[in-house]
Swiss-Prot record:
It is a peripheral membrane protein. GO terms for cellular component: mitochondrial inner membrane. GO terms for biological process: mRNA processing; regulation of translation. This is Protein PET54. It is found in: Mitochondrion inner membrane. SUPFAM superfamilies: RNA-binding domain, RBD. It comes from Saccharomyces bayanus (Yeast). The lineage of its organism: Eukaryota, Fungi, Dikarya, Ascomycota, Saccharomycotina. The gene is PET54. GO terms for molecular function: RNA binding. InterPro entries: RBD_domain_sf, RRM_dom_euk. Activator of specific mitochondrial mRNAs. PET54 is involved in the excision of intron aI5-beta from pre-mRNA for cytochrome c oxidase I (COX1) and plays a role in promoting the translation of COX3.
Length: 294
């Protein structure tokens, strides 16, 4: 009995002095990772083994953070506007860095991995608009994501200035940083919010309207810049970027022209005879407008 009590006493004294149980080995910093990086949270390991982003695929481009928060169990019986969210995250609508088109997916960026795991567990069997929610951890390293979002931010900023800056900037390199944290990524995303609210993408804009005379044609909107980002003359398809001086004009432009026939934009028919005359001359495709802030 005395021998066992001495052994127990020895274990307790060792645990009190070192904080480790007898027989354990101190963890060592892997080769290639500095002690400073390990003490600061080991970002390099975190980016690979502990993702901070959930990927959510959806064809609905109009989801907002409130939709994602609504499926938490605590909000099941609450009205919209009364939802609570103890697992804070930022909802990111993923867009193509070059043409700014919505890529049918959202990212949920969390502050820490534990919050990500908890949210995924709580919403595993949930539905949004009657569609089963399927979210998967994004294993892509944070610096790679940062590079993509920086590319998008830079291209949007250039497009907001002029077509010349946009096309020249497409070939510029983006410097990838090794050590990236969540707050840096948030800053990049926040930097484009205002520009997104003042920008629209327009498919099937009438080719008869050139960038030089669009400002005069739409004189009642305060347009900042307008140019074709993509065009296919054979298929009669084009994608135009238009930026405005204020977000209200961008919103009104989409509301007034989305779904309108191109021929009606150029020459609004007043009589049935006018309609018949324009059908054979002007493209009858519809304008599809996307407000980048939606």
């Amino acid at each position: 009995m005395k021998g066992s009590s001495k052994a127990i006493k020895r274990v307790l004294e060792h645990l009190q002095s070192t904080g480790r149980v007898l027989g354990t080995v101190e963890s060592k910093v892997p080769a290639g990772i500095s002690e400073e990086a390990a003490l600061s949270g080991g970002h390099q390991q975190l980016q690979i083994k502990k993702p901070l982003i959930l990927q959510f695929r959806s064809y609905n481009p109009y989801l907002v953070k409130e939709d994602i928060v609504s499926i938490l169990p605590e909000n099941q019986y609450k009205k919209r506007g009364q939802f609570t969210n103890g697992l804070d995250f930022q909802l990111i609508k993923v867009r193509d860095p070059k043409y700014f088109q919505f890529k049918d997916q959202y990212y949920l960026l969390f502050n820490d991995h534990n919050s990500l795991v908890e949210y995924a567990d709580l919403t595993r069997l949930s539905r949004i608009n009657k569609v089963r929610v399927r979210m998967t951890p994004l294993m892509q390293p944070l610096p790679n994501l940062m590079t993509k979002f920086q590319r998008y931010s830079q291209n949007l900023h250039n497009a907001f200035q002029s077509s010349e800056k946009y096309f020249e900037g497409l070939t510029e390199k983006i410097d990838a940083k090794n050590m990236i944290d969540v707050t840096q990524l948030w800053r990049v995303l926040d930097s484009v919010r205002e520009m997104e609210s003042k920008s629209v993408l327009v498919w099937n804009f009438p080719t008869e309207l050139q960038s030089s005379n669009i400002l005069n044609y739409f004189w009642f909107y305060n347009i900042r810049s307008s140019f074709k980002m993509y065009w296919d003359d054979e298929m009669k398809r084009n994608l135009r970027f238009i930026s405005f001086e204020n977000s209200n004009d961008a919103y009104r432009f989409k509301r007034n022209y989305h779904g309108l026939l191109a021929k009606e934009l150029l020459n609004p028919p007043r009589k049935e005879k006018d309609t018949l005359e324009t059908n054979s001359v002007i493209d009858d495709s519809k304008l599809l407008i996307e407000h980048l802030n939606e």
